[in-house]
Each structure stands twice: as C-alpha cells, then as structure tokens.
C-alpha cells in the first residue's frame, strides 16, 4: 500500500465523489472522478482509500461527516490517500500465428444444386440419414415403424412441386389422385432446357413456333381448381360429403321480365312512399300509373284521384290540408277544423295569434290605446283590455318620488304622502335612514325621522 498526500486548491467543486464510511462499515474511498477536474489533475484515481481529510483521521468519520468536512475546507483541501500496489504482471505467453486459415469453396455441388424430380420420387438420402434410419429400425418396434415413418414423412425436404402426405390422402378420398393440373404440365414443359444443336440450313428443316399455353377445358381441370367451394365441402370437421350438380337457370324471356317488373312495382307501390325508380302505383286505387301523376305526403296519386275527403274536389291545384290522415280542401278544412277568433268569431284560416288562452286574428288582437297589432311583443292588461308597453307606461306607469325612476312590475314599493316610493327610496331627507314600517314626519312633502322632525329642511 502506498500512502501519499494530495492538496487541492479551491474553490469547489473538487472533481471527485466519495463512497463508504463508518456507518457503512466500509472505508472511505474515491468512487468517481470528473474528467479534467481538480482531483484528476492532481493524480487521484478511482479506488484510492481516504486516510485523512484536512489532517483528521477519516476512519472514524461517517459518510455525511466526511462530506461536511470536505465542504468546510473552503479554499484548500488536504487529503491523505492510500493506493494499492499493482500486482506484478505475469509473463505472457508468446502468441504463435495460426495455421493456414480454412478455405471455403463456393463451387456448385450436388447437395446444393439439386435437379427437379417427378412426383413420387424418393427424397435424396445421405450417409447420416441412412445411419439414423438403421438405428431407428433397430430401436423402434415393427408395429410403430410405419406410423413413425408416416408422421415424419412431411418433415423431409422435398422440392416445391412435391405433394404432402395429407394432400395425397385427400386426393385418394376424392378419387382425383391420378388427375393432373394442365397448368403444372405446361410449367414442366417450359422448365425443360432445350438442347443446343448445330444450326441446320433453313431449307432442310422448317422452323416451328413455340407452342403457347392451351386453355384447359373445365372437364380436364381438377375439382380444387374449378370448384371454389371444394375446400369448404371437404373441410376436416365435416363427417360426410355429398357431391351435387347444379345447373345454371336459363335466361328469362322478355315476357318474364315484364311480368316480374309489374309484380315488383305492384308489390312495392302498394306500400306508398318513394318510388325508388320503380313504376309508380297510385295510393288511392293501387293501380300502376301510366303518364302524369302527383306526389303528396310521400305517396303517388293519379291527378284525378287526389281529391278532398269531404267535398270530392280535385286538389291538383290550390293547396290542401291534412288532418288525421284525411285530405281536405281549404274551404272544407276551415268549416270543419279551423279555430274561431275570440273577437270577431270568424274562422281563422291564415296567421293566428294565441293569447290569454284564446285564438285571435292578428289584426283583431291590438292595443286598446293605439290600435296597433301586438303580435309577439309584450303587453299589459288593464281593466280587461290589452295595452302595448309604451302606452301602458304612459297611461298607467308609476314613478318613484325619491329616485324619479319607473317602478317596474315585481318591484317592491309603498305609497306615502300621496306618492309612490321604492322601498329603498323612502328614507329621511336629512339622515337617510330607511323609514319603511317606522313612524315618520312630513315637511314640504319630504319624509323625516323622529329625531329630525323639527329640523330645517
């Protein structure tokens, strides 16, 4: 152990961090250094033990006491440190250069470039597979040998055109194991590389064009390529399968088309409503409309059958009213359903006014003073007659004697000395105390309290 002393010139920061202490039962030591800091420049290293701080033994200091001691040093910090001697380095074994590095060849081989083989050909086997197969034949009983081989058959690598065991079982069940897709046959032919031969004279051998793909007929294609519902019928969860043949219905004749259109129009038109591009059907007689027609209340009508329910008048022009599902002309509706005016007792057919739980013609409900129709404006009732707001304030409005402002409806007021007062305006003319409900005196039409009854106003 090498002990040495380090003096750092202030001010802080000092560029190191402590760890350990008496409270941790671990000697104080340097845990971290700031790169380029004062401690790093003075040669302090991570892991140095702190023996003393500013001349005081650090072995009896806790972690917090050591930090406080360092903070109290001010402009000069003296540390006694101890550093473990580095262990003697062991002689290193001389490194010998490795032998020639292994060389890898990327030439094509039989294991990497396999040629295509026809369906059903056995997969290629190597020595390792043959040894494993012999070992399995020795260990596995004959009863389970076949099942093991069948279960592991799909694990062996096979070319992209090979068929899995489950697919061959499905083909055997459906009777299509000997059928072959013409598209696959054409792909086989196209994948064959033509042999290169010496060019012959053009006159001796005629040049043949490359045959294009022939369109397969529906009968020569397998059922999984022709029938889109093949996979659904032979799903694993089906207990039995039934093959059925469906024939496409013949194209309907124009007469059948016309009959279906008529039936659709008759069925859809009886319900009324919108036509949606179909032949309109009269809502009254339930017959197909040929030519002009009317649309009212969401239904189609013959023009001559859209009539008043009471007088039978054709309502093609002039407007109509609908009441409880029945249609009326204006005159019949006025006689039967129109309300009566409370003033003139006549039927109200145009604009109507509702006031005082009665109905009025708008020109009949007017101000009693200016004769102006009140319509939707505010009005006041006085002695059974309506008044507009302006005339009512002019004729019956009340002003406060104290503030000279109008006493609105709903305001609290009182009457005294022959005038009307707001309850807050009836006060003593001298001390302004409120006199509502109290004894007061009057002098020159001004209220006075009992204390100022004889004062000069």
UniProtKB/Swiss-Prot annotation:
Residues 1-85 form the PDZ domain. The modification Phosphoserine is found at residues 78, 111, 247. Induction: Induced by glucocorticoid or BMP6. Keywords: Cytoplasm, Cytoskeleton, Developmental protein, Differentiation, LIM domain, Metal-binding, Methylation, Osteogenesis, Phosphoprotein, Repeat, Zinc. The modification Asymmetric dimethylarginine is found at residue 103. InterPro entries: PDZ, PDZ-LIM_domain, PDZ_sf, Znf_LIM. GO terms for biological process: actin cytoskeleton organization; cell differentiation; heart development; muscle structure development; ossification; positive regulation of osteoblast differentiation. GO terms for molecular function: actin binding; metal ion binding; muscle alpha-actinin binding. SMART domains: LIM, PDZ. It is found in: Cytoplasm; Cytoplasm, Cytoskeleton. GO terms for cellular component: adherens junction; cytoplasm; filamentous actin; ruffle; stress fiber; Z disc. The modification Phosphothreonine is found at residue 96. The keyword Kinase does not apply. Residues 280-338, 339-398, 399-457 form the LIM zinc-binding domain. Expressed in kidney, heart, brain, lung, and skeletal muscle. Overexpression results in the synthesis of an unidentified soluble factor which acts on cells in the osteoblast lineage causing them to differentiate and secrete BMP-2. Residues 81-132, 186-226 are annotated as: Disordered. Binds via its LIM zinc-binding 3 domain (LIM 3) domain to endocytic codes of INSR, but not with those of IGF1R, LDLR, TFRC, or EGFR. Interacts with various PKC isoforms through the LIM zinc-binding domains. Binds to RET in a phosphorylation-independent manner via its LIM zinc-binding 2 domain (LIM 2). Probably part of a complex with SHC and the RET dimer. Interacts with TPM2, TBX4 and TBX5. Interacts (via LIM domains) with SIPA1L1. May function as a scaffold on which the coordinated assembly of proteins can occur. May play a role as an adapter that, via its PDZ domain, localizes LIM-binding proteins to actin filaments of both skeletal muscle and nonmuscle tissues. Involved in both of the two fundamental mechanisms of bone formation, direct bone formation (e.g. embryonic flat bones mandible and cranium), and endochondral bone formation (e.g. embryonic long bone development). Plays a role during fracture repair. Involved in BMP6 signaling pathway. The LIM zinc-binding 2 (LIM 2) interacts with TBX4. The LIM zinc-binding 3 (LIM 3) domain provides the structural basis for recognition of tyrosine-containing tight turn structures. This domain is necessary and sufficient for interaction with TBX5. This is PDZ and LIM domain protein 7.
